[in-house]
Amino acid sequence: MTKKIALLLLPFILISCNGLGPKRVKNIVELTPKLAIQTHEPIYLDSNANIYAFNANMLKNKQYSFARSKTITEPVFIGDMIYALDIRSNISAFSIEKNKIIWSYNLSRHKKDNYIGGGILHHNGKLYVTYGSRLLVVLDAKSGYEIIRKELPDIIRIKPIVLNDNTVLVQTISNQTIALNAETLKTVWEHESLAEVLSASYFMTPIVQYDNVIVTYNSGQILALNITNGEVKWNFEFTNLNDRTAIPNFDESSILCTPVHDNMNLYIATGLGKLIKLNVATGSVIWQVNAEDIQSMSLIGNSLFVTNNARQIAAFNPETGKVKFVADLNDGQDPKKLKSAAFLVPFVGVNNNNKRSLNVISVNGVLYSFDVDNNGLNMIPHVVKIIKNIRYYGLSANNNLYFSTDSKIIFGSK
């Protein structure tokens, strides 16, 4: 009898022992290594990139419904029209002036299916559309009439791009890059790398740089391909980075967010916990620094701004890779109580008094604005509650600032 009682009490005895029993699990904000200031250098927000006439009250303007269902890609603005692609593979043309959908066309023959990824390219009066299937569909932009479609070897999760007036480019999830004639969709050239079993969580839209197009593969490669014939000019592999080895099929071999570039350099955040600067002419590494779980990046003035899963915004010196500014995006809360948040690309806003601020939008519905004064960029932001689920922002065809969720759009001047 005594033995039976002892056995029944054993689990409770073990739980009460030091080191056993329930423990609080750290959240991703706590687990992400924080960036720290390494050098004290001035920050100038004086470039033309990512600077907009902006104030927080814009986000209270009227919201317009511009698509049939929830959108899955960034809207495209051409004149008065907004072209949007939704989760049901409907592409819609929305007139800003008339405040209504002018035409809508379903790209799939399986209307009940949900699709992920893809995008819209407007080129020479046509829309080249991918929607997370194997198909590239070309429509007349004015009428929505289907002109031609082509089935590719595998699913396409990124938008097509223009290589030149006669050629468009698509890339599949199985590491196939295919240049197509813009009229006939016949293959001009193609390049293929080793296909991986699992796909990366983020797919980078190829970047045209002079005579080359820069592409990435989920095997951990970045390549510069000649836009005329697809020849490889240079090839960089994440396995060349120090300290850790990229593992195919996992996030370590992936790119975490949209890279940024200037005329000579490409800045990339990798799943290896590295932020790297590449020379676009040669593919050589100029510098690499430790920076975990970067969400978004922006080149503004003399700084490379990044946000990360630790809910920080930081400024790197683009020349050296050293951190010169760090601030928290935490609403003043205890980090242990913070939930993860997704942050859009930082941008600079200029208000009616011509004063500038650095702004970060959280998809959770929070705007963080850092003022600039005589002492530089403030480390404590103004925190403003805004509408949730803003996914994109930018300039419309008439240079009007817009913000879009997965179903609504807001214009800055409306």
Curated annotation (Swiss-Prot):
InterPro entries: PQQ_b-propeller_rpt, PQQ_rpt_dom, Quinoprotein_ADH-like_sf, WD40/YVTN_repeat-like_dom_sf. SMART domains: PQQ. Pfam families: PQQ_2. Gene3D superfamilies: YVTN repeat-like/Quinoprotein amine dehydrogenase (2.130.10.10). This is Uncharacterized protein RC0314. The lineage of its organism: Bacteria, Pseudomonadati, Pseudomonadota, Alphaproteobacteria, Rickettsiales.
